[in-house]
Amino acid sequence: MTKEVYVIDTETSTTHWTEGIPNGHIVEIGVAKVNLEKFTVLPAWKFIVSDPSASPSAWIFENTDLTYDEVMEGTNPLIVSKFLEDKLKGKEVTAYNIAFDSMMLDRDMPYLNNCVRWGQDLMIQSSKVPGIPRKHAGKDTWPRAEDSYNYLCPKDPCNLHGKEKHRALDDAEMEGHILLELFFRGLYTLKE
């Protein structure tokens, strides 16, 4: 059995949160395949997902190169969900902050969320590594993905130059390298 884990990342059209729930929907989803025997991270799939309710002033459009028009012309979420269900059913999947990605998937693509086997959360596992910065805006927090990547991957295999792109596939690949480093340190264990 090949030791593979799929890393999923979502980007959303969120403009604000109400009682811990974001108002947006998934507008981009990226999946990277991590092979723990070959120590590789490869792009698997990426989709721009249609969200007719998206606001042109959403954070994602103002802080990345993803455009409002791309999302308006994106793939129907049901088509994306069905494709990824077929590819990922029964596979081990993880994310950096599973609680967020799982919440978004549960709302927008529930069948996909329920057909995968969630592995260990990369954010929680990264918090066990001494030295990764845990302060953001002056507050103690969970380590941010880019801080974990910069600390664990000083050779910068994704050529990010210290800055997370906030594009789903790019971030999934970055998080895949975090997974490899956690695995090397014995901080990520495959589900059997």
Residue spans for each PLM region:
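Conserved non-catalytic scaffold segment of RNase H-like nuclease domains
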Residues: 2-110, 116, 146-153
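Acidic, Mg2+-coordinating catalytic module of metal-dependent nucleases/exonucleases
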Residues: 92-99, 103-108, 135-192
